[in-house]
């Protein structure tokens, strides 16, 4: 049937996205009115090639229906599973269109949020809400406020069943709301689902099912009354109230006449309702689907339910991959060997094993092989990926240091570390505790010493002048004997925390913190440097730098008393401008952390302002600052210290990532190193939310048992193997140590693969 939507299905890297882009290019060439199709049996396979005149062109049928009526340009909605994939897809589509077509590119959750914000007035009328602009809560704010709202119920539940931490219990409750909303399930049905699915598993959720439903409804109503939105509330508002609204449906049909949805196997169930609404309104669409994808299954995605859209589309099945990979020849053998370990076989040379006794030896041996391959120019670093079921700090640090010692950069994919892991952030938080009253219990001498080192950075120009003076002294053979005069060898200490020398080195900072810092629960303070009995040994530069920090803090305290500092965000900005020179000369990871700190602080005070206005009380500003500091110290707020797309030499880097992040990124490499191949986490790794299977549309309604969990894990492992094999070009190294870091023997499910290969050292 001419003009019907297209459903493109195929394995990993079979060319589905390229097919989608080719369809869009043909739509562009036809002026939005479709191109000529070909006669071919429905649902027949397509062989995708890359040469001109390939099956991509011959098998692509037109999107023939006119996309718009009237004089306005048709709207194009482009959806991708995650933000990074969205950027890549948008770049490729923009190249095809040469910027002549306006594309609205987003993710499903991003689209729901934009629509709820844009049509908030409709929801105000429908739900009888207060007319105020909504504010989206960040996850860290969401958990903090929910904990405060549910305090009595949480205390009662944890008092009766102390097997679960409070933070985890709150997170599970909030995740239930998000799962229900993404699945298109009313909150009122959650207790019934939990009763049927958990079958009274008190250890997992120590709250009565009815009370869980009441708490979720209380939270939802509390947020709506204050104009606060979370992802779970946004998704619920969208599918339950906004999408069925006739005014919205009319506007939606006018805005979008073409839908391009990539990787719909990663989309939530309510996305299908959106797609069907667009199709019913006459929009054309191209969907891509990977039957063995489902990376986000357990995080709100429902690939089986989304696959039902294929019944409304013309199905194009892509068989051959444009680029060869190990999956073409080995996927059946690998999967069979893992699922049936009794089946003995020998794997080809493309699969090699690195076996050691301890994990430390394994990390060193893995790094040695990578270094040798790069130095002998067998492969470029950018073509190597080290993939593990979970990358711990030991593996990340060890591999990064070992490779960096040989000038091989390492890219840690989406390595989101707590903000407080950055010394610069900790120093700024210490500044807050010294300026605002009542925060003395949040600071200690160690934090003060670190602050003195970090914030005594020397300006770039002054640092060069000082270096020149030191060089002159060395050239003339002079040596400074008096540390109180001139610049001593450690007066400008090149701290690893800062790119420029610090005027206060760690030793002097420790002495100053010990002798000049006065702890106090309400007003901790820094005394003059002369309080230190041997202050003459500090040196001129260190004394001056310390005194400048003390005077700056006292100035801010005075201005705070005069109400010249509106909030802590302003104070943080002042500190960054004064001590860190605006952050312009800092490494990227520190700039990223500073940016995330300011964004988190701005959002926190925006929410605080909304709550103060609603509750009509004026609590001390220090109370909000205290909560903010404790929130950061808990490690809830994170920042990605690396750019999305490294540039320069850093772009030619070995990729270090876990399985979930690697599959989500859709990358491919010539060589893959499967780290910790003997780990049980390949089968039982946790990458799903609590009770997620109960919120799939295909759930049977029976209680979820251990057998169901094992079956789901085995299907997940099969998808992982097929996906990784499809992204491996030439070689896979199975990296296995007999003992884990904890000293326990590793007998994971992939051990059958390790045993089927000849160890690398034995070749």
State each model region's role:
Residues 5-8, 149-259, 338:
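Accessory N-terminal region flanking or inserted into the helicase ATPase core
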Residues 210, 521-658:
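Accessory C-terminal helicase-associated subdomains
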Residues 676-756:
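C-terminal accessory regions
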Residues 72-181, 185:
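Conserved P-loop NTPase-based nucleic-acid remodeling module centered on helicase motor cores
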Residues 378-384, 388-463, 484-558:
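ATPase/helicase motor core of nucleic-acid motors
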Residues 82, 106-111, 259-265, 596-600, ...:
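Conserved helicase core region in the C-terminal RecA-like lobe
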């Amino acid at each position: 049937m001419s003009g019907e939507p297209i459903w493109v299905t195929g394995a990993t890297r079979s060319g589905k996205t390229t097919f989608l882009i080719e369809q869009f290019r043909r739509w562009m060439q036809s002026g939005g009115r479709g191109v000529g199709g070909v006669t071919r049996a429905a649902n027949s396979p397509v062989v995708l090639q890359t040469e001109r005149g390939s099956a991509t062109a011959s098998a692509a049928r037109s999107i023939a229906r006119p996309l718009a009526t009237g004089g306005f340009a048709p709207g194009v909605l482009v959806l991708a599973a995650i933000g990074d994939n969205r950027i890549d897809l948008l770049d490729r589509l923009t190249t095809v269109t040469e910027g002549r077509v306006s594309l609205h590119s987003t993710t499903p959750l991003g689209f729901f949020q934009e629509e709820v914000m844009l049509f908030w007035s409709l929801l105000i009328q429908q739900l009888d809400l207060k007319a105020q602009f909504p504010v989206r809560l960040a996850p860290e704010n969401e958990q903090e406020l929910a904990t405060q709202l549910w305090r009595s119920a949480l205390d009662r539940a944890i008092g009766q069943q102390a097997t679960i931490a409070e933070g985890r219990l709150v997170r599970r409750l909030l995740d239930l709301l998000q799962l229900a909303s993404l699945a298109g399930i009313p909150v009122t049905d959650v207790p019934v689902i939990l009763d049927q699915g958990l079958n009274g598993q008190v250890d997992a959720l120590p709250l009565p099912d009815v009370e869980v439903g009441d708490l979720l409804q209380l939270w939802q109503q509390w947020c709506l009354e204050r104009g606060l939105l979370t992802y779970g509330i946004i998704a619920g508002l969208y599918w339950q109230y906004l999408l069925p609204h006739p005014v919205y449906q009319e506007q939606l049909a006018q805005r979008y006449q073409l839908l391009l949805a990539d990787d719909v196997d990663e989309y939530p169930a309510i996305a299908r309702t959106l797609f069907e609404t667009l199709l019913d309104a006459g929009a054309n669409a191209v969907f891509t689907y990977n039957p063995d994808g489902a990376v986000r299954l357990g995080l709100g995605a429902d690939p089986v339910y989304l696959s039902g859209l294929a019944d409304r589309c013309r199905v194009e099945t892509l068989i051959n991959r444009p680029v060869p990979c190990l999956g073409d020849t080995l996927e059946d053998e690998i999967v069979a060997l893992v699922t049936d370990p009794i089946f003995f076989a020998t794997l080809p040379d493309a699969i090699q094993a690195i076996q050691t006794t301890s994990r430390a030896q394994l990390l060193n041996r893995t790094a040695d092989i990578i270094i040798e391959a790069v130095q002998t120019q067998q492969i470029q670093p950018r073509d190597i990926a080290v993939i593990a079921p979970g990358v711990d700090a030991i593996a990340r640090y060890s591999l990064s240091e070992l490779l960096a010692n040989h000038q091989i950069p390492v890219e840690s994919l989406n390595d989101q570390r707590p903000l407080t892991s950055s010394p610069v952030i900790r120093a700024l938080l210490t500044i807050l505790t010294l300026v605002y009253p009542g925060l003395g219990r949040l600071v200690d001498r160690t934090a003060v010493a670190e602050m003195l080192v970090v914030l005594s950075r020397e300006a770039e120009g002054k640092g060069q002048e000082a270096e020149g003076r030191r060089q002159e002294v060395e050239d003339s053979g002079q040596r400074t004997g008096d540390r109180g005069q001139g610049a001593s060898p450690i007066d400008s200490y090149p701290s690893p925390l800062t790119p420029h020398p610090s005027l206060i080195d760690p030793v002097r900072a420790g002495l100053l913190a010990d002798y000049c810092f006065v702890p106090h629960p309400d007003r901790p303070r820094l005394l003059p440097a002369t309080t230190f009995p041997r202050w003459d040994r500090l040196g001129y530069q260190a004394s001056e730098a310390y005194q400048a920090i003390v005077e700056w803090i006292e100035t801010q305290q005075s201005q705070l008393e005069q109400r010249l500092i509106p909030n802590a965000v302003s104070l943080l900005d002042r500190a960054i401008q004064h001590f860190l020179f605006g952050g312009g000369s800092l490494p990227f990871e520190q700039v990223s952390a500073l940016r995330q700190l300011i964004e988190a602080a701005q959002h926190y005070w925006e929410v605080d302002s909304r709550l103060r206005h609603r509750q009509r009380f004026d609590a001390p500003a220090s109370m909000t600052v205290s909560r903010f500091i404790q929130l950061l110290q808990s490690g809830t707020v994170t920042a990605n210290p690396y750019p999305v797309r490294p540039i320069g030499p850093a772009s030619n880097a070995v990729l270090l990532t876990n399985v979930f992040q690697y599959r989500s990124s859709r990358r491919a490499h010539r060589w893959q190193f499967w780290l910790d191949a003997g780990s049980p986490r390949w089968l039982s790794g946790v990458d799903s939310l609590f009770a997620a299977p109960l919120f799939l549309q295909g759930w049977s309604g029976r209680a979820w048992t251990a057998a169901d969990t094992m079956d789901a894990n085995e299907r997940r492992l099969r998808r992982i193997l097929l996906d990784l094999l499809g992204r491996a070009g030439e070689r896979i190294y199975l990296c296995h140590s007999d003992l884990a870091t904890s000293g326990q023997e590793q007998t994971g499910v992939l051990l059958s693969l390790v045993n089927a290969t000849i160890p690398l050292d034995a070749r």
